[in-house]
Amino acid sequence: MLDEFPYLVERDPSLPSVIQSIVDSGAMRYNLLICGSSQRMMQKIVLDGSEPLYGRASEKINLSPIRAQYWWHALNLSAKQVIEEYSVWGGVPRYWVLREQYSSFDDALENLVLDEHGALAEEPEALFLDDTNAIAPYISIMTAIGQGNAKFSRIADVVGHKVSELAPVMKNLIAMHYVRKEVPFGEDAEKSKKTLYVIDDPFLDFYYRFVVPARPLLSIDRTDVVLQNIHDHMAEHVGHIWERLCQIAVSGNNVFGHTWNVAAHWWGKVPVFKEGKKTPVSNRELEFDVVAESMDDKDTILVGECKWKSADHAERLLAQLQEKVKYASFAKGKKIVYALFLREQPLSITDCKMMFPEDVLKNLPK
C-alpha cells in the first residue's frame, strides 16, 4: 500500500511512470493499493487521460463518511443522542475519536473546535489545502452559505465576485461533497431557476454556522458566550440535519406501504384566492420538508413534516400539514400519505404515519 500517494509524486514525479511500467510488463505479482486524501489529485492521477496510470486501476474506491446509523450501532448512545452528535461531528472517524476523549459535548466542542489551538479549530482550511493552495474562494463561498445565503447570485454578491468566476470553485465543492445543490421536488435539477446551495457535510455546516461568525468573541476569550449561543440555536441546526436524514431514510425505501422515489424538500409561492374571485389576491410562501412520489403508484405522494423539538400533539401537527397541502400544486389530484418525523413521541396519537429517531436510523441505506 502506498499512502498519501500525491505527496510521494510531489517528491518524485517519475513514480507513476515506474508503476505503469511494472503493471504493463505483467511483472506485478501482488495487489497494489494507492491511497490519498486529496480527492482532486487522486482523480487526476487515475482519471486524467494524459497521466501514466490512466486506465490501470482495476477498482476505484471513494471512501465516504460513515453514515449515522453505524455510530448508533458502535457507540452506547440513544438514537436521539447519535443524531445530535452526528450533526456536529458528521461521519469522519477521526472526529469521533477526538470527541471520545472528552466526557461531555461542551468540553469536546470547547477544546477541539472553539479553542484556537484545538485539533479541529482550522479543519476546513486543512481540508481545502489537501486539494488546492488557492483556498480563499473556497472559504468565502462556505462562509457565505453558512450565514444563510443559498442562491448562487446572492453568494457571489456576498463574496464580491461574478457567478462565472466562482463557478469552478463551486463545482469542486460539490464534487468533494462539501456542498450540494437542492431544487424543489418535481423540478429538473439542470433547468430549475430555484436552485439552492447548502453545505452537505455536518461538521462543516456546524463550523460555518456557529464558529466562523464567533471568531471575534473567541479571540477575546468569550467562549462561554459562544457556547450559550450554540445551545440556544442547536435544535435548529440539528433539525436541518434531521430533515436530510429523514429524506434519505424514505428515498428508495419501502415504508408506509409504498416504495418511494428520491425524497426532496419543496418550497415556493402559491396563489391565494378569495371566495368567488378568479384572480389571486396574494401569494403564500409554502415549504415541505419531505416530499416523494411512490414508485408503485405515480398518483400517490408522501408529504412529511420534520420536527426536532419538544413533544407536541400529533393531531395539531397533522392538521397544519393537511392545511398546507391544500395549496400545493404538486398535490392536486394525488393521493397523499401524510407523515410526521418527530424527535419525541407525540403528546397524543392520531391516524398518521410517523417515524422517530430509531426508525430513521434503521431505514438509512446500508
Indicate where each model-derived feature is located.
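A cross-kingdom feature that marks ATP-driven nucleic-acid transaction machinery
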Residues: 195-366
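Phosphate-binding site recognition
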Residues: 1-227
